[in-house]
Amino acid sequence: SATDLDSAGIGDEDEEELYPEIRQGSLLWLVDSDVGFKLVDQLVEEINTKFYNLDISDGAIEYQYTIYDNPTDHYDWHQDYYEDDDVEFVRKLSISICLSSSEQYYGAEFFIKDGNDLNVRTFKMKYGDFIVFPSSCEHRVNMLREGERISLVIWYGYYK
């Protein structure tokens, strides 16, 4: 149940605004001591070294536990990347980890643009599946039709 979670907004933990036409769902911001993902950190560092070579020198900073459990829950096209004057932490690499089995939900597929609007990849994620991608890539979760989709998103980058 999402009763202890907040409504999913847009922004970071400090400045989050609700736009239900863009995003609906529930979330909980976690701190590093809440999750011990040293193996995930190591995996992300290896993927970054091999494929992206982005500045993630300060490691994992933000953790977001998200539940889509209402038939209209979704997150429209967006980027996780913010590098304006107001942010302390610059997100460079994102990982989305699915915590639901594929039988637990219908809809809520993960879409990501691979460089341009013409090359969109779609993933029906199941428990344990994960996607690592540059935070500047546009992506979305389409509308949940039924069930419950749970994910953990972790952002890696650096402090300004």
Predicted regions: what they are:
Residues 91, 105-160:
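Catalytic core of Fe(II)/2-oxoglutarate
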Residues 65-70, 85-104, 155-156:
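Short, conserved beta-strand element in jelly-roll/cupin
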Residues 74-82:
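Histidine-centered catalytic micro-motifs
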Residues 71-73, 147:
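Tight coil/turn sites that cap or link beta-strands
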Residues 1-57, 62-64, 68:
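Non-heme Fe(II)/2-oxoglutarate
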Residues 67-69, 81-83, 97-101, 114-116, ...:
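Short, flexible loop/turn elements at secondary-structure junctions
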Residues 61, 75, 91-93:
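Hydrophobic core residues within well-ordered beta-strands of beta-rich domains
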